[in-house]
Amino acid sequence: MSNVPTAVKNIIIINVLVMIMTALNENFMYEKFALFYPTSPFFHWWQPLTHMFMHGGFWHLLFNMYTLWIFGSVLERVWGAKKFLVFYFVTGLGAALIHTGVEWIQMQTWLTEAAQGSYAAQTSIHALKMTPTVGASGAIYGVLMGYAMLYPDSVLTLLFPPVSLKAKWFVLIFAAIELFTGVTGTGGGIAHFAHLGGLIFGFILIWYWKKKHTLYSRMD
């Protein structure tokens, strides 16, 4: 990893170490560092940050860290380590905010139904409070948005299916898929609105830097 930029390298190392720690004491790591709904008895104020370093399994970790290595390295070489970290954490925290906001909307509906005696709503409320969210995917989607906005016409090729498209179209397709699956509830067990949140906050931050004419300024 000698050619991997400093910030990206350190993020990958921390994620791998946290995965090892989770394997050694899964219950403790999830209860303390995964992201729970704010009214859950397991919620702690630091979880919007720490959940970004936890993953649900080896393949979840591998996909996120591989994507970070490929696209995050490009962004860090343009922006410098400090500016890349600002972008990474803003998009990751923004993803957590959007995800929790959507959960809050769901919760209001269920609370109303539960007050009317709905057992299904009561079960849904309990499940939401007890179900943690983990992963750097929100920040990773932010990184993808950042890359697509800096290099919109660069051609990317997926391994499966073997399709080549410009980066800007890839991101738009990903956004459409996440919106559809999030709204329809398909693809359960995946925080689709967190992915959308990462894309949204990535877009906003890039737009802000462009407006301030600081997009290509470095912070090392």
Where are these regions (language model features)?
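A detector for small-residue-rich transmembrane helices and their helix-helix packing motifs
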Residues: 1-220
